[in-house]
């Protein structure tokens, strides 16, 4: 089985494409089961966040596995394959593992070092496990990846600087108004992103926080947590007329705020300036709303332009994280190679024992009656011949296991001694020629 990753993110696809292929949380289990029905895939994990959509899987045939996932994403997004392919990246074998390590470390995020991604990856893997869709190799890859993410955050300062998307949204509001104190801030949605945004707003000195959500109970719970005020969803227009800043992060599948609605609100406000920050995917606010007089609209892609005052410190932390990542990749490769090398050595030793027994039986039959001492000497000599003959190839294979040519040496040894492939590890075979069998795009 070979690991593969197919996906798109904020670097490869605009929000218009990302929102087409994104999955609502309620859709993920169904999507996982549909993917599981595809015979080319095994051990499937689906990661869907506001900035990325990625499918991790194991497959016996890399080309086929990649192809069926691309077709699946095209169908889900109601796009032609040729239209979506330009936005997709593909990682296979060790590149797939390295990519996941980068993701959990926060090195592949829009805001480098963000803290949310570690939990999002853990949740994605947990959903797969609950549906019994993980296999041994995917389990090992994700367990190692989560350990890498935790190690990076414990040994570097990559998460000690404000680096989440929700924090960046607050920073954008502060840069626009100079300060959020004294401003009326409306948060649409009561999920994790909304809670994080409210946390950063209060930490920045906001004294009026309004929360509106379709579930009044959830809105009240979030508002109470931050001494804010819950607004019934039916009174959203009134809240929009009151607010200075609106940060929208719902899980709606359609636009919550459209131009005609916002036009009425702005008339009530008498065109008083309003800042809208849409950090939802799919977007909550229709892009044409930003064309209205007095309205400034930023969507999640616009957050890239926010100046990060901690850039230098974060870049240094990223260098440290990169070193940790490569160290952990080395350990993973060594572990994975052992899955292939150890069974090969066992199979080689077993082959030696089989040949020894066959030749001993033949020799003893030809010799006729001999005493116990003579038979013991003959058996000892046969054991020594096999042991000495296999010593060098086994020792050299162990030494080569930790090099880039390890799999090549292993395959050569298997072919030379005609070892039974059924005796070898089911995870074996990420060889040099396999690694070259599929192009891996950057993403």
Swiss-Prot record:
Catalytic reaction annotation: (S)-4-amino-5-oxopentanoate + tRNA(Glu) + NADP(+) = L-glutamyl-tRNA(Glu) + NADPH + H(+)
Binding of NADP(+), residues: 189-194
Site positions for Important for activity: 99
Described function: Catalyzes the NADPH-dependent reduction of glutamyl-tRNA(Glu) to glutamate 1-semialdehyde (GSA).
MF (Gene Ontology): glutamyl-tRNA reductase activity; NADP binding
Miscellaneous field: During catalysis, the active site Cys acts as a nucleophile attacking the alpha-carbonyl group of tRNA-bound glutamate with the formation of a thioester intermediate between enzyme and glutamate, and the concomitant release of tRNA(Glu). The thioester intermediate is finally reduced by direct hydride transfer from NADPH, to form the product GSA.
Protein name (record): Glutamyl-tRNA reductase
């Amino acid at each position: 089985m070979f690991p593969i990753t197919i996906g798109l993110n904020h670097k490869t696809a605009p929000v218009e494409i990302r929102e087409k292929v994104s999955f609502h949380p309620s859709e993920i289990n169904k999507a996982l089961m549909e993917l599981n029905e595809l015979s080319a895939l095994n051990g499937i994990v689906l990661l869907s966040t506001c900035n990325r959509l990625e499918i991790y899987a194991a497959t016996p045939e890399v080309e086929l596995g990649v192809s069926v996932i691309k077709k699946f994403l095209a169908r889900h997004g109601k796009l032609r394959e040729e239209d979506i392919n330009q936005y997709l990246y593909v990682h296979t074998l060790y590149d797939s593992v390295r990519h996941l390590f980068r993701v959990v470390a926060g090195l592949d995020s829009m805001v480098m070092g963000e803290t949310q991604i570690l939990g999002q990856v853990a949740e994605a893997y947990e959903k797969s496990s609950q549906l019994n869709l993980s296999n041994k190799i995917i389990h090992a890859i994700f367990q190692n990846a989560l350990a890498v993410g935790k190690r990076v955050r414990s040994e570097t300062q990559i998460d000690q600087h404000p680096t989440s998307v929700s924090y960046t949204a607050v920073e954008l509001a502060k840069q626009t108004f100079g300060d959020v104190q004294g401003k009326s801030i409306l948060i649409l949605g009561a999920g994790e992103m909304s809670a994080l945004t409210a946390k950063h707003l209060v930490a920045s000195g906001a004294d009026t926080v309004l929360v509106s959500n379709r579930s009044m109970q959830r809105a009240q719970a979030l508002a109470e947590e931050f001494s804010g005020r819950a607004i019934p969803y039916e009174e959203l227009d009134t809240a929009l007329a009151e607010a200075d800043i609106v940060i929208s992060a719902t899980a709606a599948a359609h636009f919550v705020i459209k131009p005609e609605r916002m036009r009425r609100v702005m008339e009530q406000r008498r065109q008083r300036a309003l800042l809208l920050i849409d950090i939802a995917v799919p977007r909550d606010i229709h892009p044409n709303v930003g064309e209205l007089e007095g309205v400034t609209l930023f969507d999640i892609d616009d957050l890239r332009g926010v100046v990060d005052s901690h850039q230098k410190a974060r870049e240094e932390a990223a260098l440290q994280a990169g070193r940790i990542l490569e160290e952990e990749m080395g350990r993973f490769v060594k572990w994975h190679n052992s899955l292939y090398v150890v069974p090969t050595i066992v199979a080689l030793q077993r082959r030696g024992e089989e040949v020894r027994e066959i030749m001993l039986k033949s020799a003893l039959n030809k010799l006729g009656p001999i005493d116990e001492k003579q038979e013991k000497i003959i058996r000892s000599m046969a054991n020594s011949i096999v042991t000495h003959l296999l010593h060098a190839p086994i020792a050299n294979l162990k030494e080569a296991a930790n090099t880039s040519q390890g799999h090549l040496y292993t395959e050569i040894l298997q072919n030379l001694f005609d070892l039974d492939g059924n005796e070898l590890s089911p995870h074996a075979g990420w060889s040099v020629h396999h690694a070259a069998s599929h192009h891996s795009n950057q993403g």
